[in-house]
Swiss-Prot record:
Catalytic residues, chain numbering: H182
Protein's name according to its UniProt entry: Ribonuclease T
Domain Exonuclease, chain residue ranges per copy: 20-195
Summary of subunit composition and partner proteins: Homodimer.
Organism phylogeny: Bacteria, Pseudomonadati, Pseudomonadota, Gammaproteobacteria, Vibrionales
Length: 217
């Protein structure tokens, strides 16, 4: 593989990190006390031209953990009227995270990346809930970096002058259905599309690959 082609790989593009897009729906803003109710993850892949695309999607409704706080306003906002309804088909936090991490590890290994990194819109929020769930479930092997993220709110503010997901997507020329918003599945898919669009646009403008140092050649 030539130096130029080597640069057009997921491993090279993100310094060995494997980007995974995540969105959570919750019963409040406090990751320590409020329930995690829904989670979705979308992995990414890079084609032979160095363009980034969504790859696999995994999604779960999640049962509130024992003693979890449920804020009425949060439930009204995300449309989850009864978190305990059997019709949700919810699983435990541990079941959801283990299945998500199994997929991430498999695709991370295939991409020859050393660690996963979370991509999310206002990523600190999503990462805080995932980290809190990891602690509650006493999960030792967590693929995500504990604090580093790619935040599409920041990136879209730079690229499109918009930080709200719906407005950023529309400014980027994407379709966005406000009736579907605040579903972890829909929001993750749109965040993945937005992130890929920003990365690919930067490449098209000549921002990547970087000019290789002579020593690296």
């Amino acid at each position: 593989m030539t130096v130029e082609n080597t640069a057009l790989t997921l491993k090279k593009r993100f310094r060995g990190y494997f980007p995974v897009v995540v969105d959570v729906e919750t019963a409040g803003f406090n990751a320590q006390t409020d329930a995690l109710l829904e989670i979705c993850a979308v992995t990414l892949s890079m084609d032979e031209n160095g363009d980034l695309h969504p790859a696999s999607t995994i999604h779960f409704h999640v049962e509130p953990f024992d003693g979890a706080n449920l804020e009425k306003e949060a439930l009204e906002f995300n449309g989850i009227r009864d978190p305990f309804s059997p019709l949700r088909g919810a699983v435990t936090e541990q079941e959801a995270l283990k299945e998500i991490y199994k997929l991430i590890r498999r695709e991370q290994k295939a991409a020859d990346c050393s660690r996963a990194i979370m991509v999310a819109h206002n990523a600190a929020f999503d990462l805080s809930f995932v980290n809190a769930a990891n602690e509650r479930c006493k999960l030792k092997r967590v693929p995500f970096h504990p604090f580093a993220t790619f935040d599409t709110a920041t990136l879209s503010g730079l690229a499109y002058g918009q930080t709200v997901l719906a407005k950023a997507c529309k400014t980027a020329g994407m379709e966005f259905d406000n009736r579907e918003a605040h579903s972890a599945l829909y929001d993750t898919e749109k965040t993945a599309e937005l992130f890929c669009g920003i990365v690919n646009k930067w490449k098209a403008l000549g921002g990547w690959p970087l000019i290789e140092d002579e020593n690296e050649k």
